[in-house]
Amino acid sequence: SSNKADPMTMGTNGVINSAKEMTLVYLPHLTAGSVSSSMINQFASAARNKVAAVNIDYAVDSSNNEVTVTHSYVDEQGAAVDTIAGMHPLHWKNASQATTPYQIRSARGTIKFAELSQFSYQIPYVGVLPTLPSIDGSFNQATLAGLVTDFVNQGSNVWNTSADGDLYEDTYWSGKNYGKVAEVSAIARSIGMTAEANDMIDWLKAELSDWFSSEADGVLKTKKYFVYDSDWNTLLGFDEAYGSHQRLADHHFHYGYFVRAAAEICRVDLAWCGQDQYGPMIELLIRDYAADKDDPMFPHMRNFDPANGFSWADGKMNFIRGNNNESTSEAATAYGAIILYGLATDNTELTEKGMYLHASTGATYWEYWNNIDGYNNVSAESNNFFPGYAHITTSIIWGDGVDFATWFSGAFAHILGIQGLPSSPLIFHVGLHADYMEDYVNLGLSESSNNKPSGLVDDQWRDLWWNLWAMTDAQAAIADYNSVSSYVPEQGESKAHTYHWIHTFDELGHLATGTGEITTNHPAAIAFDKNGVKSYVVYNFTDQTIPVTFKQGNTVIHTMNATPFGFTVE
């Protein structure tokens, strides 16, 4: 309707267009008094431009791995529609799109309104590696070999058991342990313990092939298998955990662990992931949580929300506060696993899909979980947390806001530590801002008896905190690690991995790629900075030497030739 009503004076208005339709608009008015006529006129000008759909697409620039995300507003015929769109902080902070003077606060922060038919924004890609490299002189070889041997000598019968010795047969805890074994296997192989690495890979093959088969000895199984449910368009793994059946919750977490373990198998035995072996089953798991728009079996990007740029955990989302998401690191693991699998199998489409999901997960972690602009006092409108929020971070994002909590504990070590599990080179996004990380670690350890991981009580993830601390101050993490003679690893972590992680970060320094300042043209390439000295790490999944370039802005700062099937560190 062309009628305009002031809601403060109300009044009666008729619908006077031929369609007998009207558009109701909540105007973004933040101050007391009447809404300005200029605001009313601007919104009225687009009020009858009917938007039937918003198409969200991504593209990866292979020259610098920058990801561009485009929101397009279309009518029922698919033609572009001029409208006034609300741009969330992730959008307007990373776009060149001009906005109107009108804005409003939301659960995510300031929404700015813009006249447009589409907008695009750019986010940096963080990068992944199959494991951290083993660099001569960065650790004691005998110590690391001993920790790998200790893990192997436990026996494979305990690799997928709880601390009490109970065997796991659900998708979450089994997947978590498969990821752990994949990490130890990769470390073992990197230091020449090939026999031990192969033993772990053989165990992973047996475990995953068991899950990927519905029968045992000609009889249908009741545990450790997947089935497709056509009513709900989903793949269900038996046994379920944490509502993965009843609520279709956390599929990206659970199945991402399986894909991560499978990707390590593919890295060392590509034939096992062939289309005539287990490749189709691995890709079916990926499709369940990261399907294309036109997938006939699964919803588009089940857990990932392209509009917000991050993932939601729950499938039912019938909470009063809407949906929620806790661990960005488990989401990043799921999406990073797609990248590793895509690189190992030379599947560019999957690799770039994983890069988009992984980059967006990292960008939104810093935008919404850590409110990095608020932390840096950029401006009032850039501060996404509501006035009076007492912390520099949050653990749970809800539809209506944030919550400094976890689902299982009120301990600060858990509330902040959950963003550091599982610890692997798929979660580098958590360590991007080393200065911020100092305050993050201090807050997470503020309830420790000595403000260090060694002072945490049992089951508060000492090892994960050493790993997080190493991303900002590796020498301090190592010193505290060396003060502890015995500890129980977090369920998805191993002593070999922790030792390797903290000493490798001590050698390499802080992450230097991932914020957009330094970029590279390879998905498995990372730059580090230690006291102003750069190190460049590349893993080449192919059988050919490949050139890799690192840039600062448009200036090339390093080029290297990455050797086939392995790490190159310069």
Write out the residue ranges for each language-model feature.
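Acidic, serine/threonine/proline-rich low-complexity intrinsically disordered regions
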Residues: A271-G274, N347-T351
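Alpha-helical solenoid repeat scaffolds, predominantly canonical TPR units
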Residues: F258, L285, L350, G354-L357
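Alpha-helical scaffolds that organize eukaryotic protein assemblies
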Residues: C273-E283, R287-N303, L340
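Ser/Thr/Asn(+Pro)-rich, low-complexity disordered segments
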Residues: S1-H252, D292-F310, D314-G315, G342-T345, ...
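Aromatic-rich carbohydrate-recognition surfaces in CAZymes
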Residues: Y168-R189, L204, H245-G274, Y278-I282, ...
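Alpha-helical transmembrane segments
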Residues: F319, N324, S329-L343, T351
